[in-house]
Amino acid sequence: MRLAGILLHVTSLPSPYGIGDLGKEAYRFLDFLKECGFSLWQVLPLNPTSLEAGNSPYSSNSLFAGNYVLIDPEELLEEDLIKERDLKRFPLGEALYEVVYEYKKELLEKAFKNFRRFELLEDFLKEHSYWLRDYALYMAIKEEEGKEWYEWDEELKRREKEALKRVLNKLKGRFYFHVFVQFVFFKQWEKLRRYARERGISIVGDLPMYPSYSSADVWTNPELFKLDGDLKPLFVAGVPPDFFSKTGQLWGNPVYNWEEHEKEGFRWWIRRVHHNLKLFDFLRLDHFRGFEAYWEVPYGEETAVNGRWVKAPGKTLFKKLLSYFPKNPFIAEDLGFITDEVRYLRETFKIPGSRVIEFAFYDKESEHLPHNVEENNVYYTSTHDLPPIRGWFENLGEESRKRLFEYLGREIKEEKVNEELIRLVLISRAKFAIIQMQDLLNLGNEARMNYPGRPFGNWRWRIKEDYTQKKEFIKKLLGIYGREV
């Protein structure tokens, strides 16, 4: 069955509380998807973000925790955990991270003081014990110390049992505050996901390849990463120099110690996927090529130039994962430098690959051209890392424009390019056709979500337009091209 969906991160939804959240507007958006005939909603990672990491959902202090800025304040009010006077409304514009981190934390502190059902927290802690105990303790110590885990005293840094016991007793209140925050987030998300299911909408989640060095994941499982005796990274992740960057990209995350992952039967990965399948129906695997071979750069290098390719045990990993999750919920983000080995890995396990129509018109044989897109692909109009179609077209070279017009059989005006490319994506054989919301709204570079390589100023775009006006237009197209549900 050929399906269609919208790519829109939760932070981009309208909301009076400074950032898109899990409140009324998220439910309204799901109603819109249902009324149009869509069956998929793709989001970016829901993990915690921070100002220090440029608010990137791909740079988090936990690959398991939820981002408290997405919590809906009105639900806290409905549960009598805060008062009406505690609600602050902000003008609808870009995501106000600087304000929202403080504001939502204050609200949650008040809500925690008024919370009485501690048996619910204990049940939640038990259910999520494989990550939450360590995460809540990590957050409590980090608050107390005011620095990252690798700067803590040796006994805490190295997780010595007695030291952890002592600090847990000392910081019990803060520990339970962070358990409470996660309890609220997961409760609100589960409620929203149930609503989506009732409307026949599946949610596509997104799994970043690596956690940050300054994360609970690395502190809790140092043996699963390539660290030295002082727990400093031996190598960090990135991508080599290419056409777009002479020095490559240096991400700075510690790389996996795959030998240890294999030794423990990939237990950490199984838990991670299992955890995320409680939240999502499908999982996009960011930087899929890293499962076949990854670029590692010696720690301390200023660019990615002096890195090297190292083989990863992708075949063994996916064999194991698919024995646990036979429905194969994965989508490979296989864009960029892709070798035959990466293709072979994806095809061996029948994992759908990603194609983007914006890449289609740079050469005649492109695998991104609609007639070359295969059934086992997810076809995008654009992605969070790319300009929306209108912005892309504005900067498109003469040769590529010519190819586009030849492909369409006529020249078209700038304001119509988004419609034409949406049609081409929908008409393809791809099992999933995903339209980025900015393309449905015909927005340009002002609405771009992320500029890779630019550390700050990203992830701020929010919907200001009345998107429901697009309902009849898109409903008709989904019907014409056999993707309406």
From Swiss-Prot:
GO molecular function terms noted in the UniProt entry: 4-alpha-glucanotransferase activity
One Pfam family linked to the record: Glyco_hydro_77
UniProt source species: Aquifex aeolicus (strain VF5)
Alphabetical UniProt keywords: Carbohydrate metabolism, Cytoplasm, Glycosyltransferase, Transferase
Localization: Cytoplasm
Entry EC no(s): 2.4.1.25
GO biological process: carbohydrate metabolic process
Family: Belongs to the disproportionating enzyme family.
Gene name per UniProt: malQ
Keyword set includes Cytoplasm: yes
EC top class named in words: transferase
Superkingdom to which the source organism belongs: Bacteria
Record has Lipoprotein as a keyword: no
This protein's name: 4-alpha-glucanotransferase
Reactions catalysed: Transfers a segment of a (1->4)-alpha-D-glucan to a new position in an acceptor, which may be glucose or a (1->4)-alpha-D-glucan
GO cellular component: cytoplasm
PANTHER family found in the cross-reference section: 4-ALPHA-GLUCANOTRANSFERASE DPE1, CHLOROPLASTIC/AMYLOPLASTIC, 4-ALPHA-GLUCANOTRANSFERASE DPE1, CHLOROPLASTIC_AMYLOPLASTIC
